[in-house]
Regions:
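An N-terminal assembly and electron-transfer interface module characteristic of large anaerobic redox
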Residues: 1, 5-214
């Protein structure tokens, strides 16, 4: 949860103080805060406190039968091989092909620009696809890896859920692929068959990438 969620509908400013001695940027932020407060007072806007908690939607066995699982494109050669690997295990798995500037712009609308660039790409691809009208929003799910480490990649799943909530699509399940049991879903299981096929896809992806970029 970011500051924007904690202080939702309240005016706040975030000051970043590092090793430099020039506080010009901090002064500008404070002036902007004061200006925003004055504007709000003139408009007599009423504050409404909103809850910031998100309820996780479980991906069930029933959903597995007819739901399309969307996966953001994060490595073109590898993921083109992973898609058939997941499909062969009974998942209607689709790797998105919209990794372009437009999806990044969409990502900027739903993710704080202080987040890392890959998170903008990932969330942007997903939201661009869901907003395109191509998919039945009540028969679609999203999948994302969750490392469990200190990198923000662990929090991509939270970014996605927050974006879905902002777009009024909080009912769409977001499935976590992780090896640490962080989240589990009855309709999505990393069994030996799937892991073996995914491993082969990753290995051949490395081989093909080495040949292409040699």
């Amino acid at each position: 949860v970011g500051l924007g969620d904690v202080y939702k509908r309240q005016i706040y400013t975030c000051l970043k103080i590092d090793e430099v001695n020039n506080l010009g940027a901090a002064r500008i932020r404070v002036r902007s805060l004061l200006s925003a407060i004055r504007v709000r007072e003139k408009k007599h806007q009423e504050r409404k406190i909103m809850p910031t908690n998100l309820n996780r939607v479980i991906f069930t066995e029933e959903m597995r039968k007819d739901y399309t699982i969307l996966c953001p494109q994060m490595s073109p050669i590898h993921f083109d091989l992973l898609e058939p690997a997941f499909r062969s295990c009974g998942y209607n798995f689709e790797v998105l092909d919209n990794d372009n500037r437009h999806s990044v712009d969409i990502g900027l609308k739903y993710v704080n620009n202080d987040a890392c660039y890959p998170s903008l790409c990932v969330v942007g691809q997903i939201m661009d696809a869901l907003l395109s009208g191509k998919y039945d929003l009540h028969k679609v799910a999203v999948v994302i890896t969750q490392t469990g480490g200190g990198c923000r990649a662990t929090n991509y799943i939270g970014f996605i859920r927050r974006a879905l909530e902002k777009a009024g699509m909080e009912y769409i399940p977001v499935v976590s692929i992780n090896m640490g049991g962080i989240e589990t879903n009855p309709g999505f299981k990393l069994d030996a068959n799937l892991l073996t096929r995914a491993a082969f896809g990753a290995i051949f992806g490395d081989i093909f990438m080495r040949c292409v970029y040699h």
